[in-house]
Amino acid sequence: MHVIVGAGPVGTATALLLAERGEQVRIVTRRGTGPQAPGIELVAADAADPNRLAALTEGAAALYNCANPAYHRWLTDWPPLAASLLHAAETSGAVLVTMGNLYGYGPVTAPITHDTPLAATHPKLVTRVRMWEDALAAHRAGRLRATEARASDFAGPGSYGVLNEMALSRTAKGGTAYVMGDPDAPHSWTAIADVARTLVTLATDERAWGQAWLVPTPPPVSIREAARRANELIGLPAPRVARIPYPVLWTAGLFNTMLREMRTTHYQFAAPFVLDSSHTEQVFGLKPTPLDDTLAATAAGYRAA
């Protein structure tokens, strides 16, 4: 059995992939939501309750942290949830597989590789760093087995993030994309399907344990180029992409929680932000989904909606 905490795009994709492979899956969310499919059990529970989560994880081969607290609640929500996940993994013997991101690296001036150190200094970004450090310390102490997959901004149907919400959801219908940062800066976009495949691989391959891995991700393109290619793939002309000046973004953040939180990660879009996943690809034989395939499916979905 595999236990997944969270039923967002990543948790859902991972559960469906495991179920397709004949595995039994238990998804834990506060409201018991998630995909309805053979082999998938939906459980309503507070995953931050260590005893409850440990009971739900008993006998599991792997425990996947696919939770995604609202960004403005990271400092309050992540610590108890992370502690509960560690307790459940240690108690049950399940491999703890965490869906991570690139926030822990902080601003970078070169592509992020397997060897790039975690150097974030903002308290919210450091939260994710500490989560991994705590899991790694427990792994090295022999208390549990842990690994982590780190992806760039998500791409693909059903995913949330800058590419879909600020660009493709608008441009696929002939509208204008309004984006923060530099719309021409190269950026890595990771397909949700590739995240799921990587998580399942890390859970079942002992070579992955005790390390963090970058999810296979195609070559970077700017958000302007991504929107252009997406439109071309569904037969639309190149869209208009407008930049939101930082002072405007800052001011809008006074009235909108999400925009306010984007100030913290604005650096990821103000300059090239690139992921080099070649090490993961070489070790596990995984390859990223071609970006055009992901863009075409996403744009077609928005066009038809």
Regions found by a protein language model. Give the residues of each.
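Conserved beta-loop-beta element that borders a ligand/cofactor-binding pocket
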Residues: 101, 133-158
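Amphipathic terminal alpha-helices
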Residues: 281, 289-305
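Hydrophobic/small residue at the entry helix of a nucleotide-binding pocket
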Residues: 10
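Terminal hydrophobic/aromatic helix or amphipathic segment near a protein terminus
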Residues: 227-274
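Substrate-binding strand-loop-helix patch
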Residues: 158, 186-193, 213-233, 242-250, ...
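Conserved Rossmann-fold NAD(P)-dependent oxidoreductase catalytic core, especially the SDR/UDP-sugar
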Residues: 24-26, 83-130, 147
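NAD(P)H-binding glycine-rich loop region in Rossmannoid oxidoreductase-like domains
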Residues: 33-35, 40-91
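Substrate-positioning beta->alpha
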Residues: 159-166, 180-203, 210-214
